[in-house]
UniProtKB/Swiss-Prot annotation:
It is found in: Mitochondrion inner membrane. The cytochrome bc1 complex contains 11 subunits: 3 respiratory subunits (MT-CYB, CYC1 and UQCRFS1), 2 core proteins (UQCRC1 and UQCRC2) and 6 low-molecular weight proteins (UQCRH/QCR6, UQCRB/QCR7, UQCRQ/QCR8, UQCR10/QCR9, UQCR11/QCR10 and a cleavage product of UQCRFS1). This cytochrome bc1 complex then forms a dimer. The gene is MT-CYB. One of its GO terms (cellular component) is respiratory chain complex III. Belongs to the cytochrome b family. Heme b b566 binds at residues 97, 196. Binds 2 heme b groups non-covalently. Component of the ubiquinol-cytochrome c reductase complex (complex III or cytochrome b-c1 complex) that is part of the mitochondrial respiratory chain. The b-c1 complex mediates electron transfer from ubiquinol to cytochrome c. Contributes to the generation of a proton gradient across the mitochondrial membrane that is then used for ATP synthesis. This is Cytochrome b. Keywords: Electron transport, Heme, Iron, Membrane, Metal-binding, Mitochondrion, Mitochondrion inner membrane, Respiratory chain, Transmembrane, Transmembrane helix, Transport, Ubiquinone. The chain crosses the membrane at residues 33-53, 77-98, 113-133, 178-198, 226-246, 288-308, 320-340, 347-367. A ubiquinone binds at residue 201.
Length: 379
């Protein structure tokens, strides 16, 4: 008798995606982050759903409703901190996932890569809107500064900002619509994840060597299911340790002060996972130029497949490109650090240097190094 998982209309889709899926035998732990992101999304949707049951999206009560969740709701503090730190874990996995794609040349699957970039933008938008909801001091001013950047768009900028705000400043209308979109977007993200997986399963997975692995495939279950479960355990242990021992480690103390439009914090900054882009934005003195650089810092990923000049797909056997890749990682860490510092000497010049290096490495140095490596290998 044929197994039901291979004949049932629904089960055979799950079977071909997670059980009998042929996978390269050489996948390292860097391929775990896709499934970890799935777990992060599930955790965020579940904790967010329960938080939404007690949260009120009104400027007068939003801050107090979050306090009520933490103090009066059963395990409300756990839900709140799992959701807040789960977002940080989400972005850690997301950046490692993108980094792995850059290192091993996964971007040559252009459809999967482009849907991934859309996902990155959608998750960033979701995180930004969720960031505003507790209505703390830094949340409020962060929302004001970031949304105000849209006023740099010529001709329609000011109208666009007021349209998003629902008035002449970040107020009740803004909070209500941000809550509505923050609730909706994760489900759009989940749908995009399905499209991402659909395109991935059309081509099959890349592998660390970057060479076709068709002759050497193994079934996804049990080999990679066990490997993924180990990844889940490690990530959930790290998340639990963060939530139960230092839940405010990655947050800002100003957010324990209710939002006050009459009192500006000395240094406005977003959450740590946006600091690299924020540093690039601040490093350009012109407002429109800064906004364009901010968008390009993420959108530049879309032209990485076009800039791939190497005859080899992966960086595994390209030591010069490896050096540049790790220099890029160092530049990103530097930008993240600078984004959290005040706008003064020497941070301004360090930020500008790191921003120039970021674009220079991706647009010029990496393609040039790839061409040189081809020449050295006489290809």
């Amino acid at each position: 008798m044929t197994n039901i998982r291979k004949t049932h209309p629904l089960l055979k889709i799950i079977n071909s995606s997670f059980v009998d899926l042929p996978a390269p035998s050489s996948l390292s732990s860097w391929w775990n982050f896709g499934s970890l992101l799935g777990v992060c999304l599930a955790v965020q949707i579940l904790t967010g759903l329960f938080l939404a049951m007690h949260y009120t999206s009104d400027t007068a009560t939003a801050f107090n409703s979050v306090t009520h969740i933490c103090r009066d709701v059963n395990y409300g503090w756990l839900l709140r901190y799992l959701h807040a730190n789960g977002a940080s874990m989400f972005f850690i996995c997301l950046y490692l996932h993108v980094g792995r794609g850059l290192y091993y040349g996964s971007y040559t699957y252009s459809e999967t890569w482009n849907v991934g970039i859309l996902l990155l933008f959608a998750v960033m938008a979701t995180a930004f809107m969720g960031y505003v909801l507790p209505w703390g001091q830094m949340y409020f001013w962060g929302a004001t500064v970031i949304t105000n950047l849209l006023s740099a768009i010529p001709y329609i900028g000011t109208d666009l900002v007021q349209w998003i705000w629902g008035g002449f400043s970040v107020d009740k209308a803004t909070l209500t619509r941000f809550f509505a979109f923050h609730f909706l977007l994760p489900f759009i993200v989940a749908a995009l994840v399905m499209v991402h997986l659909l395109f991935l399963h059309e081509t099959g997975s890349n592998n660390p060597t970057g060479i076709p692995s068709d002759p050497d495939m193994i079934p996804f279950h049990p080999y990679y299911t066990i490997k993924d479960i180990l990844g889940f355990l490690i990530m959930l242990t790290a998340l639990s340790a963060l939530v139960l021992s230092s839940p405010d480690l990655l947050g800002d103390p100003d957010n324990y002060i209710p939002a006050n439009p009459l009192n500006t914090p000395p240094h406005i900054k977003p959450e740590w996972y946006f600091l690299f882009a924020y540093a690039i934005l601040r490093s350009i003195p012109n407002k429109l130029g800064g906004v364009l650089a901010l968008v390009m810092s993420i959108l530049i990923l879309a032209i990485v497949p076009i800039l791939h000049m190497s005859k080899q797909r992966s960086m595994m056997f390209r030591p010069l490109s490896q050096c540049l890749f790790w220099l890029l990682v160092a530049v990103l860490f530097t930008l993240t650090w600078i984004g959290g510092q005040p706008v003064e000497h020497p941070y301004i010049i360090i930020g500008q240097t790191a921003s120039v290096l970021y674009f220079l490495i991706i647009l010029v140095l990496m393609p040039a190094t790839s061409i040189m490596e081809n020449y050295l290998l006489k290809w």
